[in-house]
Amino acid sequence: MEKIKPTLNGAAETMLQSFYARAKYSKSKNCKFYDAKAVEIVDKLDYDFDDAHSDSTMGNGVIARSIVLDELVGDFIKKNPDCVVVNIACGLDTRFYRMDNGRITWYNLDLPETIEVRDQIYNEHGRVSTICASAFDPSWPEKVTVRGKMLFVIEGLSMYLTAEENAKMLSIIRDNFDNAYVIMECLAKKWVNKEDLEKSIQKTGAKFVFGADSFDDLGDVAKGFEKVKDDNITRGMVKIYPILKPFQNLPLINKAAQKMLIFRKK
């Protein structure tokens, strides 16, 4: 099979770094997280992953957030087995294949250049399908089946958007879905403008421009929503490195960790 050569840049290119991190870790001994699809597909891509391979800061963060997000999404699906999930800025994410209970409906939404790569690799249809659109396109909800409680997963995106852009993205969800629940990954505020700490991300040209330490920090960005829970990826890091467990609940550690903010439409 001829390898697929992705042509991406900036924030869109960061999806390749995250994808590689999941594949690399899944091949490691005694891994606490396994992404079978990433392992299967990584060698089909014609892309220089050297920077991602050596960027342990980025890699550990990706695995920790994957562990915690799998837990959060899995819990939602367990409570709502016929739910609809919209994965915004999906990149090459494979969570559907780990979460599928045979009943959920799952949409992977991203920009045209990303969906083009994704469609070549996955050829998704049926209960899992793609939506080729910007998260700011007010028409994308027309392509989504509305049924019961709706979960919107926003991973690896908010930190690359301005507050105004994040507000616009969330307003589209708010204005179109009455039973909307959102899990939104946010950069801790102390890391805004510090993308140089993740060398593979820095080399894509993407910038960390937005962060929030809690739902309350979102303010008008999440207008029309109410808090369900503030969470973070600390326990994911502890699963990777159990030696960190004694420090898990230290305020300083929790403040610096990537946040998982869970909220719903009022």
Label each residue range with its predicted role.
Residues 160-173:
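A short, conserved alpha-helix within the catalytic core of class I
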Residues 206-233:
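Short alpha-helix
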Residues 152-153:
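A conserved beta-strand element that flanks and buttresses the S-adenosyl-L-methionine
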Residues 1-86, 90-133, 146-147:
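Rossmann-like AdoMet
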Residues 189-206:
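Short, glycine-/aromatic-enriched active-site segment of Class I SAM-dependent methyltransferases
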Residues 236, 240-266:
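Core SAM-dependent methyltransferase catalytic element
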Residues 176-189:
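Conserved beta-strand signature within the Rossmann-like core of class I S-adenosyl-L-methionine
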Residues 138-147:
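Short amphipathic alpha-helix with an adjacent loop that forms part of the alpha/beta core around
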